[in-house]
């Protein structure tokens, strides 16, 4: 197996220009495809997940071209030209979920599949929501999971659509992004969220981007959303993709652990991504944080003992970046408790289980529950001979690069899995650490 040995590292300092946000990139691509006219997308993330979306759109007859680092998408006006297709979605949840909803309203015959892990990631709550409006979606293997078969259907909306919010916010995002294409007798479509909505900041991203494409959704708390029916998606002409706030977390944590200053550029106070609030968590742990509209900078703690300190944090607002805190906890005095992280279990891998397993290999004491993780740093650091497993999960690989600030080298297995969102991560990380 391919692996990469890092550290031990003692210092982190420098500036990182972040790659584009995955969450924003795939949302923008689909909205541009549904809009009329051309949309120039600047700073799009170049990664496995965005390539999956671009290839799917091309298969569906949506034209796009690349000009330098820009992508120009020629929208379909809400009607994909190709009405029968088989689409391979890799392990891209941000692609398969909204596309499933969009295709259910297209009146075509489509099959969607992915890698084996994708076929273990739930999609049943979204399918249930779409079936409420008459969509014809069948499971080709296990009930509630891809692969899927979508057939032509008569879509009718005469009652509120109910969707669960406690498994993944991507189900609600998919409905919000695509239901404006549908017709409703009174011109409005109501979506009711059942249970507590997790990962609310990702819904904020969705609503913000919909508004950029001319779709204004009325939000009543986090329980009810009113979507305009039969709406026209209007291209903004040009749209910039912010830097990825989840990817920023590794460098900001490195600044906190390795002294800093480490500055990330591409996200800041004006960001629409919830994960920028990761910097607040580092500040609570004792790190020094500064920020502007488009940058964040972190230095180490000024405490007498030079250490960060453990915190207890409800992570609903930073679900992806919270993983980075679990590894940063190795360098904090006391125990760090991360709660409200149930969504980790249905991501690229079961991230609660995977994180607990790999932290223990380094000597940490870890308690895991259905939706929480408690991490106490190692009394004695260990170097696992078999390395750190990454579970084909880009965020596991990037998180555990921070373990190289410990007193022993750390071996990261399958480092290439970072291609999902940040192909040159380890080169960039190496540029600001020593």
From Swiss-Prot:
What processes in GO biological process is this protein linked to? amino acid biosynthetic process; aromatic amino acid family biosynthetic process; chorismate biosynthetic process
Q: Where in the cell is it found?
A: Cytoplasm
Q: Which Pfam families match?
A: EPSP_synthase (PF00275)
Q: Which residues bind phosphoenolpyruvate?
A: 22, 93, 121, 170, 351, 395, 420
Q: Name one GO molecular function term.
A: 3-phosphoshikimate 1-carboxyvinyltransferase activity
- At the top level, the lineage of the source is Bacteria
Quick one: a GO cellular component term? Answer: cytoplasm
**Reaction catalyzed:** 3-phosphoshikimate + phosphoenolpyruvate = 5-O-(1-carboxyvinyl)-3-phosphoshikimate + phosphate
Give the chief site where it resides.
cytoplasm
Keyword hit for Zinc: no
Q: In which pathway does it act?
A: Metabolic intermediate biosynthesis; chorismate biosynthesis; chorismate from D-erythrose 4-phosphate and phosphoenolpyruvate: step 6/7
Q: Which residues form the active site?
A: 320
User: What InterPro entries does the record tag this protein with?
Assistant: Enolpyruvate_Tfrase_dom, Enolpyruvate_Tfrase_sf, EPSP_synthase, EPSP_synthase_CS, RNA3'P_cycl/enolpyr_Trfase_a/b
EC no. given is 2.5.1.19
- Quote the record's binding site residues for 3-phosphoshikimate: 22-23, 27, 168-170, 199, 320, 347
Q: Which UniProt keywords apply?
A: Amino-acid biosynthesis, Aromatic amino acid biosynthesis, Cytoplasm, Transferase
Indicate the quaternary assembly: Monomer.
Its function, per the record, reads: Catalyzes the transfer of the enolpyruvyl moiety of phosphoenolpyruvate (PEP) to the 5-hydroxyl of shikimate-3-phosphate (S3P) to produce enolpyruvyl shikimate-3-phosphate and inorganic phosphate.
Similarity annotation: Belongs to the EPSP synthase family.
Question: PANTHER family from the xrefs?
Answer: AROM/DEHYDROQUINATE SYNTHASE, PENTAFUNCTIONAL AROM POLYPEPTIDE
Name recorded for this polypeptide: 3-phosphoshikimate 1-carboxyvinyltransferase
Q: Which organism is the protein's source?
A: Cupriavidus pinatubonensis (strain JMP 134 / LMG 1197)
């Amino acid at each position: 197996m391919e692996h990469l040995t890092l550290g031990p590292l003692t210092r982190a300092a420098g500036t990182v220009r972040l790659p584009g946000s995955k969450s924003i990139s795939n949302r923008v691509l689909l909205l541009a495809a549904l809009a009329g006219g051309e949309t120039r997308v600047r700073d799009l993330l170049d990664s496995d997940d965005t390539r999956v979306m671009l290839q799917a759109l091309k298969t569906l007859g949506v034209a796009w071209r690349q000009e330098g680092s820009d992508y120009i998408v020629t929208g379909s006006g809400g009607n994909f030209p190709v009405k029968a297709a088989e689409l391979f979605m890799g392990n891209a949840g941000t692609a398969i979920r909204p596309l499933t909803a969009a295709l259910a309203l297209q009146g075509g015959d489509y099959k969607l599949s992915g890698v084996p892990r994708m076929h273990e990631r739930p999609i049943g709550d979204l399918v249930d929501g779409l079936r409420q409006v008459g969509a014809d979606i069948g499971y080709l293997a296990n009930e509630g999971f891809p692969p899927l078969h979508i057939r032509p259907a008569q879509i009718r909306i005469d009652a509120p659509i109910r969707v669960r919010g406690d498994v993944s916010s991507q189900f609600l995002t998919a409905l919000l992004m695509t239901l404006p294409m549908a017709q409703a007798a009174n011109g409005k479509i109501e979506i009711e969220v059942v249970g507590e909505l997790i990962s609310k900041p990702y819904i904020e991203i969705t609503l913000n981007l919909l508004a950029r494409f001319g779709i204004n959704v009325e939000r009543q708390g986090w329980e009810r959303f009113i979507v305009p029916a039969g709406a026209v998606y209007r291209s903004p002409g040009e749209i910039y993709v912010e830097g990825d706030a989840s990817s920023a977390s590794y460098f900001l944590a490195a600044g906190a652990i390795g002294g800093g200053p480490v500055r990330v550029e591409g996200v800041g106070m004006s960001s629409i991504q919830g994960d920028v609030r990761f910097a607040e968590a580092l500040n609570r742990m004792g790190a020094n944080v500064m920020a502007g509209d488009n940058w964040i900078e972190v230095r180490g703690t000024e405490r007498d003992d030079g250490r960060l300190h453990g915190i207890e944090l409800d992570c609903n607002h930073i679900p992806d970046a919270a993983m980075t805190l679990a590894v940063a906890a190795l360098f904090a005095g006391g125990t760090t408790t991360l709660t409200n992280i149930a969504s980790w279990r249905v991501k690229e891998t079961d991230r609660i289980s995977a994180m607990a397993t790999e932290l223990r290999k380094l000597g940490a004491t870890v308690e895991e529950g259905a939706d929480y993780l408690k991490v106490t740093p190692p009394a004695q650091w260990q170097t696992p001979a078999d390395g750190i497993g990454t579970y084909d999960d880009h965020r596991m690989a990037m998180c555990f690069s921070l373990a190289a600030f410990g007193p022993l080298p750390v071996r990261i297995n399958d480092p290439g899995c970072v291609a999902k969102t940040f192909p040159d991560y380890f080169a960039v990380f190496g540029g600001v650490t020593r």
